[in-house]
């Protein structure tokens, strides 16, 4: 019989709509200003921590809607953002640097919806407010470090083999040249070094020289490593900042986008994200006197560095250990109430420190603080020129064999100790980064964007509904119900997807898909009217109308989906957000227009004697 659906299709349609409605509902309940407390490096908060939080809030007379321990994290909800900020300050001072106290917006979803993991959509920066940074990795410094490593490695190999050389000089494109006493030594060096350094192209040059340059594959690998490692380290630093639902992702070859929703202290964010501080541990060369050091007369294996007081210190160039091996660091005070930083190393770092210190007991070891800072100058491309600043913050005699844990002193004040411990805990950047773009969106503007976005959606929906009802009567009402169902399904699916974030371009995508859904219904209704004018019966006209319009609707939507997939693949940020909502909307509009409206039409007219249609 024409225009009848089997029962399972109706059941499927009802189930899909109900599920979509359930997962769309949390978006109506809004969010509470909240403070989220988590342990550093994955340590779970305990019942004792919960009691401490509750006690602190009571003592400071800060009213909380609720304070709960959930999945190893404490979530305290408040009525206003002012109360939220007061609570964060109070809890940070009490809990110290063992916990991350993050500002958050916690969904006010009822328990029965939370039980089925129904959560509201994640809002993008333009809707929620916050700060956006576009950062550029300083590839010149990253590859320069690799060049230095190659120089040290080749020098070490030549000394190990006993091949004499006179000078080592840096060359263009991060290469290097080594000068030997004669051609025999040069040829021997080439034969020895080539199989040991597959990532270098080593060639003979005139004047008893060899030249070594990195292969294109090695340079590409180094660039990729610098960006990826910086992304990982920035994510760690964002966690230390205490930001909920941040975005840290790559953009292009050497740029990184960082978005921090709800952040209010932008100066602090820039300070932590852009900081390039790390530590180097080196042995002090005690064979050079102060006068020679001040005059810069030092051996080739040493160099002069300054203390914070401006005193010269001669350090060996060989770095015993860098901040890369630091797994944890905390700030505290020593027995003299002076600030110190307690450092824990990974197993490899612990072995290096242990093996070195056992052979050098009684010798002085210096802690060198290394940082890149903006010089205030610009290069030819208008980018800030960074300068490397190094200062000796601590010199101590090695009194015993050190292991995985030790402490450093000589730090000016407790704030600096906390800052240094935070940076070391998060990890040192592989290469300096520059903030090339910064945008701040206030919470008020975010709310305004939400309001305008909702108004745009509702206006588009109302105009479409009026148009459909005016032109297609009862079939227009059926199409209207499909439009509403389409919007519910889009919101429900967006809420279900863990990585989906709704932004202003995403709202534009939703408005666009509502237009696409209207277009599909227009095609179907016009085809039915055409079949009726050709003398078909009502049942035949409905059947032929849907069948005839299907190919046009399907082809149009498939081409749109192809474009959306391409946008998602090559786009970033806002473009991806637009692609996601448009793709979801196209799929749901096909479902509601072809299956949803047909189900309603079949229920109303299927298998019945109908002589006239309201269309």
Curated annotation (Swiss-Prot):
Taxonomy, superkingdom: Bacteria
Keyword set includes Transport: yes
Sample GO molecular function, one term: protein-transporting ATPase activity
One Pfam family recorded for the sequence: SecDF_P1_head
Spans through the membrane: 10-30, 452-472, 477-497, 504-524, 546-568, 585-605
Annotated keywords: Cell inner membrane, Cell membrane, Membrane, Protein transport, Translocation, Transmembrane, Transmembrane helix, Transport
GO BP annotations listed: intracellular protein transmembrane transport; protein targeting; protein transport by the Sec complex
Gene3D superfamilies recorded: 3.30.1360.200, 3.30.70.260, 3.30.70.3400, Multidrug efflux transporter AcrB transmembrane domain
Cellular component aspect of the GO annotation: plasma membrane
Localization, UniProt: Cell inner membrane
Coiled coil: none
Membrane topology: Multi-pass membrane protein
InterPro entries reported for this sequence: SecD, SecD-TM, SecD/SecF_arch_bac, SecD/SecF_CS, SecD_1st, SecD_SecF_C, SecD_SecF_C_bact, SecDF_P1_head
Keyword presence, Ion transport: no
Family: Belongs to the SecD/SecF family. SecD subfamily.
PANTHER family in alphabetical order: PROTEIN TRANSLOCASE SUBUNIT SECD (PTHR30081:SF1), PROTEIN-EXPORT MEMBRANE PROTEIN SEC (PTHR30081)
NCBIfam families: 2A0604s01, secD
Function: Part of the Sec protein translocase complex. Interacts with the SecYEG preprotein conducting channel. SecDF uses the proton motive force (PMF) to complete protein translocation after the ATP-dependent function of SecA.
Subunit structure: Forms a complex with SecF. Part of the essential Sec protein translocation apparatus which comprises SecA, SecYEG and auxiliary proteins SecDF-YajC and YidC.
Annotated protein name in UniProt: Protein translocase subunit SecD
Organism phylogeny: Bacteria, Pseudomonadati, Pseudomonadota, Gammaproteobacteria, Enterobacterales
């Amino acid at each position: 019989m024409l225009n009848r659906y089997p029962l399972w299709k109706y059941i499927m349609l009802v189930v899909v709509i109900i599920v979509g409605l359930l997962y769309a509902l949390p978006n109506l309940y809004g969010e509470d200003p909240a403070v989220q407390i988590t342990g550093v490096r994955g340590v779970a908060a305990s019942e004792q921590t919960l009691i401490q939080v509750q006690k602190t809030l009571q003592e400071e007379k800060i009213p909380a809607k609720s304070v709960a321990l959930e999945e190893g994290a404490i979530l305290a909800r408040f009525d206003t953002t002012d109360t939220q900020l007061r609570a964060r300050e109070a809890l940070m001072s009490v809990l110290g640097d063992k916990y991350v106290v993050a500002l958050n917006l916690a969904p006010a979803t009822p328990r029965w919806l939370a039980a089925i993991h129904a959560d509201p959509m994640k809002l993008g920066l333009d809707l929620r407010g916050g700060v956006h940074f576009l950062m550029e990795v300083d590839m010149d410094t990253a590859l320069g470090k690799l060049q230095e490593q190659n120089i040290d490695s080749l020098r070490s190999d030549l000394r190990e083999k006993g091949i004499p050389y006179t000078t080592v000089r840096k060359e263009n494109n991060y290469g290097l040249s080594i000068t030997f006493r004669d051609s025999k030594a040069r040829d021997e060096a080439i034969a020895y070094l080539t199989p040991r350094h597959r990532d270098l192209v080593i060639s003979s040059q005139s004047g008893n020289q060899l030249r070594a340059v990195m292969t294109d594959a090695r340079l590409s690998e180094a660039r990729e490593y610098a960006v990826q490692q910086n992304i990982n380290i920035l994510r760690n630093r964002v966690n230390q900042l205490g930001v909920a639902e941040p975005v840290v992702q790559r953009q292009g070859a050497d740029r990184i986008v960082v978005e921090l929703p709800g952040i209010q202290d932008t100066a602090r964010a820039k300070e932590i994200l852009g900081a390039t501080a790390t530590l180097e541990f080196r042995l002090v060369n005690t064979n050079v006197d102060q006068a020679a050091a001040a005059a810069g007369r030092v051996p080739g294996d040493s160099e002069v560095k300054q203390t914070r007081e401006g005193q010269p210190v001669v350090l060996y160039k060989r770095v015993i250990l860098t901040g890369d091996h630091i797994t944890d660091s905390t700030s505290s005070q020593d027995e003299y109430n002076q600030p110190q930083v307690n450092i824990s190393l990974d197993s490899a770092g612990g072995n290096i420190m242990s093996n070195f210190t056992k052979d050098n007991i009684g010798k002085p070891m210096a802690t060198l603080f290394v940082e890149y800072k903006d010089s205030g100058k610009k290069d030819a491309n208008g980018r800030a020129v960074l300068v490397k600043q190094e200062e000796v913050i601590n010199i101590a005699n090695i009194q015993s064999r050190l292991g995985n844990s030790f402490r450093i002193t000589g730090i000016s004040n407790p704030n600096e100790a906390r800052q240094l411990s935070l940076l070391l805990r998060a990890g040192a950047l592989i290469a300096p980064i520059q903030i090339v773009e910064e945008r701040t969106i206030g919470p008020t503007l975010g709310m305004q964007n939400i309001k305008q976005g909702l108004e745009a959606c509702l206006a588009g929906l109302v105009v479409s509904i009026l148009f459909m009802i005016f032109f297609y009567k009862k079939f227009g009402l059926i199409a209207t119900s499909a439009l509403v169902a389409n919007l519910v399904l889009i919101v429900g699916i967006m809420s279900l997807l863990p990585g989906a974030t709704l932004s202003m371009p995403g709202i534009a995508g939703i408005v666009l898909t509502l237009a696409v859904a209207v277009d599909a219904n227009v095609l179907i209704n016009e085809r039915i009217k055409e079949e009726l004018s050709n003398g078909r019966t009502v049942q035949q006209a409905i059947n032929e109308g849907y069948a005839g319009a299907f190919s046009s609707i399907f082809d149009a939507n498939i081409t749109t989906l192809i474009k959306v997939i391409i946008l998602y693949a090559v786009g970033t940020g806002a473009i991806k957000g637009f692609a996601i909502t448009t793709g979801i909307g196209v799929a749901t509009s096909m479902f509601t227009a072809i299956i949803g409206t047909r189900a309603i039409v079949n229920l109303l007219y299927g298998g019945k004697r109908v002589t006239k249609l309201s269309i």
